């Protein structure tokens, strides 16, 4: 059975984990509605690529 020859220190372990991070969602400005929305998704007002394709979401 494979066993590590040396103990992995806390610093070495934590340096390996520095690449795990959150990425910001891609947000684009919609000129039709004047709002920001995520790309490739319908805006809250029902627009996608400048065209109305769905009813606006109502606040209940």
UniProtKB/Swiss-Prot annotation:
InterPro entries: Ribosomal_bL32, Ribosomal_bL32_bact, Ribosomal_zn-bd. This is Large ribosomal subunit protein bL32. It comes from Streptococcus thermophilus (strain ATCC BAA-250 / LMG 18311). GO terms for molecular function: structural constituent of ribosome. Belongs to the bacterial ribosomal protein bL32 family. GO terms for biological process: translation. Keywords: Ribonucleoprotein, Ribosomal protein. Signal peptide: none annotated. GO terms for cellular component: large ribosomal subunit. Residues 7-20 have a biased composition (Basic residues). Residues 1-21 are annotated as: Disordered. HAMAP family: Ribosomal_bL32. PANTHER family: 50S RIBOSOMAL PROTEIN L32, LARGE RIBOSOMAL SUBUNIT PROTEIN BL32.
């Amino acid at each position: 059975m494979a066993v590590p020859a040396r103990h992995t220190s806390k610093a070495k372990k934590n340096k390996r984990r520095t690449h795990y991070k959150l990425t910001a969602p891609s947000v684009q400005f919609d000129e039709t509605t004047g709002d920001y929305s995520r790309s490739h998704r319908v805006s809250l007002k029902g627009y996608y690529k400048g065209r109305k394709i769905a009813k606006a979401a109502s606040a209940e």
